[in-house]
Amino acid sequence: MAADNDECPFCTISGDLPHPFLENKRRNEDNPTFVVASTPEAIAFLDRLPLTKCHTLVIPRDHYEMLSDVPAETAAEVGRILPAVCRAVMEVSGADGFNVVQNNGLLAVCPGRNADCEVSMRDR
């Protein structure tokens, strides 16, 4: 179920930077986020702590814990803007390729860890 999450930095960014066509929403001009693409359902913006040049996040505007929780219509909108964002990143960065990564759950973050194994960045 979608819900804004006050502790989620992505919900804060999405809430501060509403799509221009959404009514009754005001943009927070103090938010330093650089928006790459924006629709009523999804937003793409440069990461504030980038791992690489032009590290861009493409997210649904509503909060979902897991990709499996995202409704099909919302996932389709995220997928619709993704190719344009990838083209823009490649053009601006001069890169010949890109990665699209989607992490789900605590174990998806490096290093992953559970009772059976431990994986560090060095092992990858």
Place the predicted regions along the sequence by residue.
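HIT superfamily nucleotide-processing domains
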Residues: 1-124
